[in-house]
From Swiss-Prot:
This is Avenin-like a7. It holds the Pfam family Gliadin. Seed storage protein. Not integrated in the gluten polymer through disulfide bonds, unless incorporated by reduction and reoxidation during dough making. Increases dough strength and bread volume, but decreases dough stability when added into a base wheat flour. SMART domains: AAI. Residues 1-19 form the signal peptide. CDD domains: AAI_SS. Keywords: Disulfide bond, Seed storage protein, Signal, Storage protein. Disulfide bonds: none annotated. GO terms for molecular function: nutrient reservoir activity.
Length: 175
């Protein structure tokens, strides 16, 4: 029962961790710049990987019958709909969520304080987390991930170069 509560708490925590770009305009200049915003579809991927892939066999069988199948669909559908280049950023985002959650569990800290931006300095994602995500997501979702994702550190992959959907939020300026 305690394990189920912890897994449910992890799923809830994962739904508020990844970033998606949106655009804001500085007042008076009308210039836009990209800012991070939660991206729910990648949260589902990290929750799926942590709850359904990394749990012991007996627990994963129980989850598979209920929520794992739904989480897999909610993860794979958006991943299949974005460009191959944007998938590299998505893989980094999922890896960073998992890394931050594991760090928070180790140190007993919350993952992200309310009102904090996701654009804190990017920490290097440990190789084992990145490898697990790169080995699992493409085959699980039947999508291709560019080869350079396996060799390029996440901290150097900027969302600005990829065709990640953006929305404009302009306060006092025109975008």
């Amino acid at each position: 029962m305690k394990t189920m509560f912890i897994l449910a708490l992890l799923a809830f925590t994962a739904t508020s961790a990844v970033a998606q770009l949106y655009t804001t305009c500085s007042q008076g200049y009308g210039q836009c710049q990209q800012q991070p915003q939660p991206q729910p579809q990648m949260n589902t991927c990290s929750a799926f990987l942590q709850q359904c892939i990394q749990t012991p066999y007996v627990q994963s069988q129980m989850w598979q019958a209920s929520s794992c199948q739904l989480m897999r669909q909610q993860c794979c559908q958006p991943l299949a709909q974005i460009s191959e280049q944007a998938r590299c950023q998505a893989v980094c985002s999922v890896s960073q969520i998992i890394m931050r959650q594991q760090q928070g569990q180790r140190f007993g800290q919350p993952q992200q304080q309310q009102g904090q931006s996701f654009s804190q300095p990017q920490q290097q994602v440990p190789v084992e987390i990145m490898r697990m995500v790169l080995q699992t997501l493409p085959s699980m979702c039947s999508v291709n991930i560019p080869q350079y994702c396996t060799t390029t550190p996440c901290s150097t992959i900027t969302p600005a170069i990829y065709s990640i959907p953006m929305t404009a939020t302009c306060a006092g300026g025109a975008c």
